[in-house]
């Protein structure tokens, strides 16, 4: 997803350098905005996957062994890309261009008459693709911290024996 996003960056740089003038057409506007959000939310979910993988490695090391296989990782990446793309399909409907004097705007959101619907859509996407993954990441790191700060079994006995000597 990062590679596709990087390929779309020159058009966004041109758009903002030309003071918000979009000469590339509505279809390409939709495509570039889709790539932006696809990259954003795929990155969030991949960071969440990394957090869960670390949690499994620290808190459940034996179970984590079967999840560390390349085939599983490939399928998980494919699932992330497909889920995020599926959630963002409505963005292709909402994003559009509109004339603004002598320039054409490529809206990051939507046209004014669809804005209420867009707010509901983008709020749901934000909760599903940012809020929940962020919560999962926080829980994973909290559980890892608790596990790492817990004394090792038998560690307390050896230190008390040393004190008695």
Swiss-Prot record:
Extracellular side, ranges: 17-30, 96-124
TM spans (from-to): 1-16, 31-51, 75-95, 125-145
Keyword Repressor belongs to the record: no
Predominant place of localization: membrane
Pfam families: 7tm_1 (PF00001)
Any single GO BP term: transepithelial chloride transport
GO molecular function: G protein-coupled purinergic nucleotide receptor activity; G protein-coupled UTP receptor activity
Cytoplasmic side: 52-74, 146-165
Gene Ontology CC terms: plasma membrane
Keyword Secreted appears in the UniProt entry: no
Gene3D superfamilies given in the database record: Rhodopsin 7-helix transmembrane proteins
Membrane-topology descriptor: Multi-pass membrane protein
InterPro entries reported in the protein's UniProt record: GPCR_Rhodpsn (IPR000276), GPCR_Rhodpsn_7TM (IPR017452), P2Y4 (IPR000018)
Cell compartments where the protein resides: Cell membrane
Keywords, sorted A to Z: Cell membrane, G-protein coupled receptor, Glycoprotein, Membrane, Receptor, Transducer, Transmembrane, Transmembrane helix
Domain of life: Eukaryota
Protein family (similarity comment): Belongs to the G-protein coupled receptor 1 family.
Function: Receptor for UTP and UDP coupled to G-proteins that activate a phosphatidylinositol-calcium second messenger system.
Protein name: P2Y purinoceptor 4
Species of provenance: Cricetulus griseus (Chinese hamster)
Gene (name only): P2RY4
């Amino acid at each position: 997803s990062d590679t596709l996003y990087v390929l779309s960056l020159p058009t966004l740089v041109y758009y903002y350098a030309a003071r918000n003038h979009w000469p590339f057409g509505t279809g390409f506007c939709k495509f570039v905005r889709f790539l932006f959000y696809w990259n954003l939310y795929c990155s969030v979910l991949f960071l969440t996957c990394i957090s869960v993988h670390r949690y499994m490695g620290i808190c459940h090391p034996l179970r984590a062994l079967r999840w560390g296989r390349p085939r599983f990782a490939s399928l998980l990446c494919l699932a992330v890309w497909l889920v995020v793309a599926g959630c963002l399909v409505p963005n292709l409907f909402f994003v559009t261009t509109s004339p603004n004097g002598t320039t054409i705007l490529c809206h990051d959101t939507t046209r004014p008459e669809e804005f209420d619907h867009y707010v509901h859509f983008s709020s749901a996407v934000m909760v599903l693709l940012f809020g929940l993954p962020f919560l999962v990441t926080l829980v994973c790191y909290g559980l890892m911290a608790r596990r790492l700060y817990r004394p090792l079994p038998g560690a307390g006995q050896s230190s008390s024996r040393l004190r008695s000597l």
